[in-house]
Design a protein with these regions (language model features):
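N-terminal binding-site loop/beta-alpha segment at the start of enzyme catalytic domains
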Residues: 6-7, 11-100, 167, 379-388
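Terminal-tail/helix-coil boundary detector
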Residues: 17, 22, 247-281, 285, ...
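Conserved, mostly hydrophobic/aromatic
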Residues: 27, 39, 57, 72, ...
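Structural preference for beta-strand elements that scaffold enzyme active sites
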Residues: 34-38, 70-71, 99-103, 140-143, ...
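Glycine/proline-rich, positively charged
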Residues: 48, 66, 111-212, 216, ...
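Generic structural signal for well-ordered alpha-helices
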Residues: 61, 84, 88, 129-133, ...
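Glycine-rich beta-alpha junction loops
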Residues: 106-108, 180, 205-210, 232-240, ...
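Aromatic-lined glycan-binding groove of carbohydrate-active enzymes
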Residues: 213-254, 289
């Protein structure tokens, strides 16, 4: 069954029931409806040594579509363009372009020696979007994101160029991935001030093992209309249960980074092993697999619009698609939160009891109807931010 029947008259209640097993959120303040689980395509192709072959990629695509998924994440970089090409072919073969929501990204350079074939300048963005459209076999991209901050290009140039792409009809919505919060804030302010297409999405790493975005990006997203798309919700497979502190052999691609000095791949830490241990206990009590519990936790955190699934086998994607079929009870969620919590960095560590007591004069301040920021409470001479 496809997402939509070619003949509307043939679209029965059974079809609707099947589709509605997946729920959808609007992406940020946009009107774009996306499934809460997105299909990542970085694993489409074996060019990088650990992905899925074409038949497996197609099977994962089909399973995702049959479950009601409509959101596909890709990038020009992924497997040297194979991911975009295969995704475009799979969508076309099933006639799903009108219902599929395609997100792609630019920034990375695939032309050694050509400095303008990468980065976030206007020249590269214009080049990259045309190349992606050609590989995808479509005339528009639903969501086009800056892949990573290049530390050089002004936000004004990026947002003006992305707005031009929207006005040209090549792009519907725009987003940012892997940027500093201050840069995202400036980009959104520029869009609002100048009437450009606003940032509808932030694509960021988030998991029980990586919670840094909670201090700035989550508040930014919820207050300024940018839905968060989560990548690496299983911490590169660490939270799947396949890795242990001491193990023989190669359990997965993360093993290749055991001795890496790159902070993004330093997953084998004492803190993370403690998280894995607690996750395993909670999953056992729920009668669920560790990946499903880890995905459920991420998907139900504040500000999260969608979670990107990155699988290499059909069995993995089928298991992942069941991640939202249950709820994590408050007590078990508290245990996961406690095991994975990290000390607040400055200045958030400064906004504590003594400071708030001086700010509020010992009163309870900020209590508003549901939907507003949590109130700042003062109890006696101490103060804190309500968790309600």
């Amino acid at each position: 069954m496809t997402l939509w029947a070619s003949d509307p008259a043939a679209f029965t209640i059974k079809h609707w029931t099947t589709i509605m097993t997946m729920t959808y959120y609007t992406l940020g303040n946009s009107g774009l409806r996306v499934s809460r689980l997105a299909l990542g395509t970085m694993t489409f192709g074996k060019e990088w040594g650990w992905g899925a072959d074409r038949d497996t990629a197609r099977a994962m695509f089909d399973a995702y579509v049959e479950a009601g998924g409509n959101f596909f994440d890709t990038a020009d970089l992924y497997t040297g363009g194979t991911a975009e090409a295969w995704l475009g072919e799979f969508i076309a073969e099933r006639g799903l372009r009108d219902t599929a929501v395609i997100a792609s990204k630019f920034t990375m350079n695939m032309q050694p020696g050509n400095p303008n074939a990468g980065g976030n300048g206007r020249k590269n963005i214009m080049r990259a979007v045309d190349a992606s459209l050609k590989r995808l076999g479509t005339d528009y991209i639903d969501l086009y994101l800056m892949h990573v901050w290049d530390q050089l290009t002004p936000a004004e140039e990026v947002m003006r160029t992305l707005d031009d792409l929207v006005r040209m009809g090549k792009v519907r919505h725009v987003g940012l991935s892997d940027v500093p919060a201050w840069y995202a804030g400036r980009a959104q302010a520029i869009a609002e001030l100048r009437g450009y297409e606003p940032v509808s999405a932030l694509q960021l790493e988030y998991s029980l093992a990586e919670r840094a975005i909670e201090n700035e990006f989550v508040p930014f997203g919820t207050r300024h209309g940018a839905g968060i798309m989560v990548w690496s919700p299983l911490a590169s497979g660490l939270l799947s249960g396949k890795y242990r502190p001491v193990q023989a052999g190669n359990a997965g691609r993360l093993d290749g980074f055991r001795n890496s000095t790159h902070p993004g791949f330093q997953k084998f830490t004492e803190r993370n092993w403690a998280i894995v241990a607690e996750l395993e206990k909670v999953a056992s009590e729920l009668g669920r697999g560790m990946p499903q519990v880890a995905l459920n936790w991420v998907a139900t955190q504040p500000g999260i619009a969608t979670v990107i699934l990155g699988a290499t086998t059909l069995s993995q994607i089928k298991d992942n698609l069941g991640a939202l079929d249950f709820e994590i009870p408050a007590g078990l969620r508290d245990r996961l939160d406690s095991a994975s919590s990290t000390p607040a960095p400055f200045p958030y560590s400064y906004f504590g009891s003594r400071i708030q007591a001086r700010v509020t004069g010992g009163t309870t301040t900020g209590d508003k109807p549901s939907g507003y920021a949590s109130p700042v409470l003062v109890e006696g001479v101490a103060a804190g931010v309500s968790t309600n």
